[in-house]
Amino acid sequence: MANDVSGLGPTAFVRLLAFHLIGLFVSITVYRLFFHNLSGFRGPFIARLSSFYLAWLSAKRLHLHDEIDDLHSLYGDYVRTGPRELSIIDPQCVQVIYGSQTKCIKGPIYTLLDPRTNLSSTRDKTEHAKRRRAWDRGFSTTALHTYEPMVQELTEELMTIIDELSENPINITEWVDKYAFEVMGQLTFGKPFNMLKERKEAYFLELIRQDMNAIGYLLNLPWLSYLFLRTPGLNQNHLNFWRWIENEFAQRIARGQRRPDVFNWLHQAYLQGPQTKSDTLKLHGDGYLVIVAGSDTTASTITHLLFYLACNKALTQKLQAQLDALEGLTDESLRDVELLDACINETLRLRPAVPAGVQRETPKEGIYIGNRYIPGDTIVKVPMYTLFRDPRSFEQPNEFIPERFTTRPELVKDKSVFIPFLTGSYACVGRRLALMEVRRAVAAILCRYDIALAPGQNEEGFLDGKIDAFTLVAAPLSLKFTRRHQQKQ
């Protein structure tokens, strides 16, 4: 038989190979369409065959959450979005998939940054719990108290820029981005990058944006993302960013701690371990996580909240009155302003930080959501954008009504689905710092200025201009700032 095969001519060999590939393709197609354990779930025909469908939806405009929302309108609570992937908005799914007792683990998408595995991309639950301890110390109440002076200083720098530019409309998105990245940059590397003070864009901010946009296009094809991030020439920006992080960490260690920062806690945990090459790469990965997860999401929330307030004068005046009554703008005093937190929550409901949801993988035995069985080894995602606008959970779901979280609780039918910072053991560790930044920035602006959309700033244009690059990135927002008589420092 071996002699027969070796005696094949080139043409015969190509034909044999073609028949083999065609047979393989047909068998995979038939299996995925009719015999796969997800064949009973509805969804686009092409999605059943290939993950390229989901990647195509994302790449069209980087509005994946809008595309997923449309699919749920067509197919219902469960949509098959890939050969072994489901998008789910059944209200019962939240605790089953993300809760503290979930049997699901993080999906394969979290391997993209290996071997620079950060806390968020750690799939093993035991290792995640071990690494989480250092992060919990770095974001504890005591630690946050030490970060507050730095946040206040940067808030004042943001206000100085608004003071100087307020005679004309201001693209507030640009300056809020710099504000959020400056905070996390200083907490990660223990030094100022002076993006606000010197009116400049730091090198790392440009690299992050380029990297995140690339990830937004390739995120739903992990194997292609893996190749892209490891192919010379294509991965140059990615490699430049990691070299920059390595250099900044080396400088931070050489300088020592000058003021409280998150890195100190992560580095202490690193020093208590074997300090292997793998540990060092994971420390670099954690630096990436602090900057990206703590910046994009916070900046987007601040910008979108300012947009909603600029469109709602009566609500803004009511909030300003409550802020004016405070003796000072401290983190402690701002936490007590219920309407401010309600506005933040409503912004996160309408514009969640990760709108298309985060990926999980079901255990081999599968899971039940109510009476619906989800087979094992299935990738599942809960699109927060759609879930948070579900009329089964929220009255007037597409309207910005912060009072649903204060004086009008009847507008919230099922509060268990609202998890803007996730829930369970994987809940956002930096939640309280993010809220401190948002409260500080928004309160400082409203105490000093009345805000309105600038002439020519279109509401729909702003909302439609956002980018879904896994995290939500706000479009440019032009606001008019008018100085108030009442001011609070």
UniProtKB/Swiss-Prot annotation:
Induction: Coexpressed with the other cluster genes on brefeldin A production optimized medium. It is found in: Membrane. GO terms for molecular function: heme binding; iron ion binding; monooxygenase activity; oxidoreductase activity, acting on paired donors, with incorporation or reduction of molecular oxygen. It comes from Eupenicillium brefeldianum. The keyword Metal-binding applies. It comes from the Eukaryota. Its cofactor is heme. Its EC number is 1.-.-.-. Glycans are attached at N37, N118, N171, N345. Its main location: membrane. The chain crosses the membrane at residues 13-35. This is Cytochrome P450 monooxygenase orf5. The keyword Transmembrane applies.
